[in-house]
């Protein structure tokens, strides 16, 4: 189910987009990954624990999720940032869509983000603490006073 969402970085820069997956706040260190394939492996890689992953490849979700390619039993990342999110996967190995996997694993995703611009910010200024959240559940003001402040987003 799609919903309005926002990405807010610790430096105050924000991006509005379309949310997918589980509707909750996802707070973590925003990083980027330049891989063209393997989003399932990246999401479940324990080395991404506590991080929000920005995929620089623009189209994510097209091969769905299978039960063989996980690096661990659960999604390690706190969130996912993409340019284009594929609603309907097409792959003979696919057992479920990426969105269904995100909901099952209670992970939020935001799409329709200018990931090239975001990646330049991260490259030039270094990783930033950020939060992805459904705009109907939080405002920026509430976000600064919530648990996200404990993660470094407070003013």
Which role fits each region the language model picked out?
Residues 4, 8-9, 13-140:
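Feature captures the catalytic cores and cofactor-binding loops of soluble hydro-lyases/lyases
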Residues 144-149:
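Conserved small/polar residues in nucleotide/adenosyl-binding loops
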């Amino acid at each position: 189910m799609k919903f309005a969402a926002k990405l807010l970085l610790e430096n105050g820069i924000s991006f509005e987009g379309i949310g997918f997956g589980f509707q909750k706040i996802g707070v973590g260190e925003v990083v980027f990954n330049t891989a063209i394939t393997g989003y399932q492996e990246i999401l479940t890689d324990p080395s991404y624990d506590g991080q929000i992953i920005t995929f620089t490849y623009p189209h994510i979700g097209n091969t769905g999720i299978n039960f063989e390619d996980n690096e661990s039993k659960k999604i390690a990342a706190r969130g996912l940032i993409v340019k284009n999110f594929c609603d309907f996967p097409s792959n003979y190995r696919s057992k479920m869509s990426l969105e269904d996997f995100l909901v099952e694993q209670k992970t939020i995703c935001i799409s329709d983000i200018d990931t090239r611009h975001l990646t330049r910010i991260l490259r030039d200024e270094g990783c930033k603490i950020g939060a992805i959240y459904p705009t109907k559940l939080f405002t920026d003001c509430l976000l600064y006073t919530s648990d996200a402040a404990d993660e470094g987003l407070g003013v």
